[in-house]
Amino acid sequence: NCISTIDTVSSGHIYLENEDITEIKEENIAKFRRENLGFIFQDFNLLDTLTIEENIALILTINKVPEKEIDKKTLEIARKLGIEEILNKYPYQVSGGQKQRCASARAIVNNPKIILADEPTGSLDSKAARQLLEIMEDMNNKMKATILMVTHDPLSASYAKKILFLKDGKIFNKIEKGEKQRKDFYNEILDVLALLGG
């Protein structure tokens, strides 16, 4: 919550590209969030009165991106996530997995510096989950976006470069992927989970 600027820190500082985000003035926080952060929530937070396309494009519209560029970026991300066929539908007309892909598209359409993801694959089938994780991995590798993901799913975690395991509110263990293959890293995650007792 502190990184997202929803809560303020009681002590210390948080830096994003040498900018102390704890010092951002209240009137500039919304602009900071729009330009730097992408959020993928467990509950999709889609606007029911907007189409899927309008939900995805919302952040670009707020940021006054030219309409042609909005159309291009929205269609491009929708294709990557396999939801281009439902762009004209409303959230109540699509499945839970399609809503999650829409929410994910909205979070990443503006290439944020940080993506905060809370169980992003929770309501997706395995194919859609893999597509989303690969897109997030691509954003991390090619666009240098930092992704902070909370997950209980070892497969989702295996897409990360670094994992912190929490137990009773404290860091229990930390592992890094390094040069390991995903399968080997996945098995290492399972070993740590066994130590954690779940």
Q: Each PLM stretch: what is its role?
A:
Residues K170-A194:
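Conserved beta-strand-loop-alpha-helix hinge in the C-terminal portion
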Residues S104:
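Hydrophobic anchor residue at the start of the ABC signature
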Residues V109-K113:
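A short, proline-enriched helix->beta-strand linker immediately N-terminal to the Walker B motif
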Residues L50-L58:
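Short coil-to-helix segment of the ABC ATPase nucleotide-binding domain corresponding to the Q-loop/switch region
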Residues G12-D20:
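Conserved ABC transporter NBD signature motif
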Residues Y90-V94, Q98-Q100:
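Conserved ABC ATPase signature
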Residues I115-D118:
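Catalytic Walker B motif of ABC-type/P-loop ATPase nucleotide-binding domains
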